[in-house]
Amino acid sequence: MSKVILVIEDQEDNRRILRDLLNSVDYEVIEAVTGEDGVRSAMAHKPDLILMDIQLPDFDGYEATRRIKANPVLTPVPIIAVTSYALSGDDVKAFEAGCDAYVTKPFSPRALLAKIREYFA
């Protein structure tokens, strides 16, 4: 059975890149465009892992992460921030919100897949 990954990303091009990459290694992909949609999708589908953009149109990925991690069923689900935020301290904000890992855009596809596989080992 393939692992389910929820991609919370508002930019269509970025969602397509992530979807194609993840599908190429047989992960099932669920997509969400906003923080609210992402939280709802996480609760409905209980994915094995979440890729979280930080800059979202309604509330940011930090808030979405906090809401997801507040649900006891979803607390153990790993969340990897995949974001263009690369200033000093941005990674700390993500970790404080509950993200388990932090990857900056543009990312290396091989490095991102390696990071994902760490959680499925």
Name each region found by the language model.
Residues 107-116:
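C-terminal output helix
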Residues 9:
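Conserved acidic carboxylate
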Residues 12-30:
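Two-component/phosphorelay signaling modules centered on CheY-like receiver
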Residues 53, 83:
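Active-site residues of response regulator receiver
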Residues 31-49, 92:
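Acidic, metal-coordinating helix/loop segments flanking the phosphotransfer/catalytic sites
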Residues 57, 75, 87, 105-106:
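The feature encodes the CheY-like receiver
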